[in-house]
Regions:
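Short, surface-exposed, charge-dense and proline/glycine-enriched linear segments
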Residues: 20-25, 93-105, 148-154
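Internal, well-folded beta-alpha domain core
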Residues: 44, 103-269
């Protein structure tokens, strides 16, 4: 992705938000075409920071616009576990179909539709998944060693905390690692339409670039069973490896126990 950045991202234009013109519920409707993959996403932690639009505009291609909420762009760090990853019609393969994953993202859209995700980088603890995703979905995957641990609590009424950690091995840039300890607590419910939480997590479209051509991918799942979370500790260099200066403001965090996901083929935009 970095070799594209130099000749595609010269414009620093920040586009105004046009939220009223965007249907943010339409992408959650299941696409009519046949899914190509099925997978389960578990123990998702969404960690977000508001950021100045001009700080991330040069890092995304000119074919998309930044998707803003109240005039702010957001960058996210999202670790989770994938299980049951398989092509439609084939069984999952033990030792291959389950692995940890983490992504660094922002939110983009087309001129007045299709609010989606732009991935700066994605880490996966499966070398096979990394190679396939880079080849088939044109996504900037990296192989990383990662682990996720549900930590016991010292008091009966205290919510469980979860430790997410990982270190990138290849390809670069290096170093790139993270260690996040978070504590989910509070009511579990889908994000309300029109809320910041809905804007951040209910994303069913991704965009990616290959040979300067823009592609769009779709996923489908039920709304996340979302829960507030508290970040107890955070040490990471993934944002820096993506060319992003992490904002100094405390992050906004949410947790979801998981959803079952259908993945649809890429198409040219």
């Amino acid at each position: 992705m970095t070799d594209i950045a130099g000749d595609l991202h010269n414009s620093a234009t920040v586009y105004p938000e046009r939220v009223p013109a965007i249907d943010r519920l339409a992408p959650s409707v299941r696409p009519s075409q046949r899914a190509v993959m099925r997978q389960k996403w578990r123990d998702l932690l969404f960690v977000h920071w508001p950021i100045r639009p001009e700080a991330v505009r040069p890092l995304v291609p000119p074919q998309v616009e930044l998707d803003l909420f109240d005039g702010k762009a957001y960058v996210g760090l999202v670790p989770f576990t994938m299980t049951g990853v398989r092509p439609v019609g084939l069984p999952a393969v033990p030792g291959v179909s389950s692995f940890h994953e983490t992504n660094v993202r922002t939110y983009v859209r087309l001129a007045n539709c299709d609010p989606g995700v732009w991935f700066f980088n994605l880490e996966a603890a499966s070398a096979i998944a990394v190679r396939l995703a880079r080849r088939l979905f044109y996504l900037p995957y990296h192989y990383a060693r990662m682990f996720l641990e549900h930590e016991p609590t010292s008091q009966a009424n205290e919510p469980t905390s979860i430790l997410y950690a990982g270190t990138r091995h290849w390809p670069g840039p290096l170093p790139a690692s993270y260690a996040i300890r978070a504590q989910p607590s509070g009511p579990i419910q889908p994000a309300a339409s029109g809320s910041l939480e809905h804007f951040l997590v209910e994303r069913y479209i991704l965009f990616t670039i290959r040979n300067k051509l823009l592609y769009q991918g779709r996923v489908h799942h039920t709304p996340y069973p979302l829960q507030p979370a508290r970040v107890l500790s955070l040490d990471e260099t993934l944002l820096d490896a993506a060319g992003i200066d992490r904002p100094e403001t405390p992050p906004l965090a949410h947790f979801a126990s998981g959803v079952n996901v259908d993945v649809f083929p890429l198409r040219r935009v």
